[in-house]
Amino acid sequence: MKKVLSMLLAVVMVLALAAPCFAAEADRTLRVEAIYTSEWFNPLVYGSTDKAVMHALFDTLTKFDNDGNVIPGLAKSWEKDGDKVTFHLNEAYFTDGNRVKASDVVFSFNTILQDSQLKYNMTMWAAGCEAVDDETVVFTLANTYCRYENFLAELLYVVEEEGYDPDTDWASQPPVGSGPYIFEGQDNARTVKLTANPNYWNGEPAIKNVEVVACIDDATALIALQTGELDVASQIGKAAYAQTATMDGVTGVSFNGWQNSGLFDFVDDVNFRQAVFHAINRDTLVAICLDGNGAPCQDLFAAKVSGKYAGAVSFTGYDLDLAKEEIAKSEADLSRVYTIEVYDADSAAAAQCIQADLAVIGIQTEIVEEEIGTWYDNLMAGNMDFSIVAMGTDMVGTEDMLSIYDPDAGYPLPVSDELVQMVKNAPTIADDDERYAEVVKTIELAVEEAAWVPLFDAPMYYAYNSSLKGTVDVTAATCVMYVGDMSFAD
């Protein structure tokens, strides 16, 4: 009996000693690095806002899962019929206790339309929005191919209409939202402090306190992750990601998203451009410039952007014999030195690989690193020979990306009038099957003219404390995170 009692007392003592640890873990503050300094807390009016803060304070109709697929958020379901999409709302409540209604969604949409800079976030995909009843809202799409679900996950935060005062100082407080956290304030270091919404409609968050701290450099972020002063480094570079593999307690994420890197070729000679297209070894680029992460492009644009067009047009990438055949047909001046303009270290590294490949077929190049503003001006003017560019976001599809060939909407590339007209025409075709066929023809011609040379799907990176659960890999590509879904491991 004494032995049993001693064992029970020992268990009680262990639990007593352990209890403060569990309490400390439950009360632990989650610290997240911001992407942008928060100087504004109203998502309906233009200002500097951070996605981590916005998604903590406000809900969106849709969300992303780990792989970037769209899943229900404030909306529990939806169905598309032609250019109409009907959303059915969950039973959700704002932080003041009022029910979230379809009219609040319409109000949020219409308020954004009144902002001269933010309105394009809506007009790119939607022509209108109306409430059918308190739980049902219908959007009229601007076109039937737009990625409306992604726009809704990223850009339409739902704000309560009742009590909304447009004259409020949004630099010091947000409007009323329905998110998992409540705004507590911002200190002089620009750290935003949030506390859990105890009445959150989708369940009270496990982590009760969140701090979103100002941006820091990668080296400082990695040290802070390892010392426990930071839990999420929202976006890091390739070198920092590689370093996470050697760090205890830190998890690095590499995510192939909606962006691919390619080469703009402004040389007005199609055989020259075809030679360049086939001279570049994409596998070498991935191995050297991405440390084996990422993948050589199989399509004109990133796999996630290509969607149903992925694999519709097959093309030959690296083929040295074909490159030599094309350069032999070219009338371009091979005695001159062509410039590859870059603006950062990563594109400069890729340029070195391309420079070596082009030298094999007799094209001499010089790498010129410009300040980003100068580089951009030269790019938009076509005042360069080559440049390496990363293109694509989760909110665009192939029809949208083809606009790079339209000088009125994209870049002054040396392409035919026929291609420009096809690019302009394809998105206007209402019938889905007819538009698909026309887009495929447009891609085929774009590949032939080779003014855009797809290189590799470009991964993006972030890192977090390994004890953190509920993270999503897609954060690396979108900077969207859901702190309300996170918890610390016991």
What are these regions (language model features)?
Residues 280-307, 346-355, 379-490:
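Detector for C-terminal structural segments
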Residues 48, 65-69, 153-205, 209, ...:
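Gly/Pro-rich hinge or "lid" segments in bacterial periplasmic/extracellular proteins
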Residues 102-108, 134-138, 179-180, 207-209, ...:
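Alpha-helical secondary-structure segments
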Residues 35-52, 74, 148-157, 264, ...:
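A structural "hinge/loop" feature
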Residues 198-242, 364:
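Ligand-site clamp/hinge motif
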Residues 79, 84, 121-163:
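Surface-exposed binding/hinge segments that line
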Residues 33-80, 110, 176-177:
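N-terminal lobe/hinge region of extracytoplasmic solute-binding protein
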Residues 8, 278, 295-329, 347-349:
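Structural transition elements
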